[in-house]
Amino acid sequence: MTAPNIEMIASSLRNCSLNGGGGGGGGRRRGRRAAAAEGSDDSEGVTVELNSEVALPYHWEQCLDIRTGQVYYINWEDGTRTTIDPRSSSAYSPSPASRSASSSSRRCSRARGRGGGGGAAAAASTTTSSGYTSVSSVGAVTAAAAAWRSHDSSGHGYGYGSYGYGYGYDGRDGDDEESSSSSSSSSSSSSASSSRGSAVSSTLSSFSPTDESASGAGSGYAVGDNGAHVLVAAGCRACFMYFMVPKTADVCPKCGSSGLLHLSRNGYV
């Protein structure tokens, strides 16, 4: 039995193809390579100039249409779309003044919308024929902003002045609210005290001007000329309140009920 020829087997394996004969498979591969080379030849020489070394204005955006390969630009301030590069336009000069002008024009338009500083805002900005806004007076813009802030503080109050909390930019609203609340509380207290009437007046009648002046001196005692009146702490059984009353008083100065419990160091007296 003769041994197999290894070289013949190796050559047959090299020419073998799973898609058919060896020659046919190699031809198809060569055809695909040729088509790819032709496609690459067609795309060669097609370039798109992006001008990346010069920055676009901040409200412009550069876009590329994938289907047509065309570069276009969108102005997000007014929504316009154009194929003209705004950097190559003679009307545009890439300086900070144009950006400040646009921001100033937006502030002025907001001020006109709120009703404050309309004339100053109109004098503050001018529009050129190319559509860009330039600032003619910085002081006018400042005046418009001040008028806008004053309109907000007086008309809206940021949730303080208009609701009467007393903490807003205009403190008069809070003062009016406090005065109205104090007047209402005083009227209610006067009506309540008139109902108690005679009992409270009889209790307070025991004080004299000399007693009040002596107690205001901080001595703790309402001492008259003869030292007969002494202030003590007393508790009311009805309203559960403690008061400083004369030692001889037996009526609550708040509710008018009798039977005050006078307190001393050792307890009740």
From Swiss-Prot:
GO MF annotations, alphabetized: ATP binding; helicase activity; hydrolase activity
Annotated ranges, domain WW: 54-88
Regions of compositional bias (Polar residues) in chain numbering: 203-212
Keyword Nucleotide-binding: yes
Keywords: ATP-binding, Helicase, Hydrolase, Nucleotide-binding
Biased composition regions of type Low complexity, renumbered to the chain: 87-106, 121-133, 180-202
Subunit structure, as described in the record: Binds to HDG1.
Name of protein: Protein CURLY FLAG LEAF 1
Organism: Oryza sativa subsp. indica
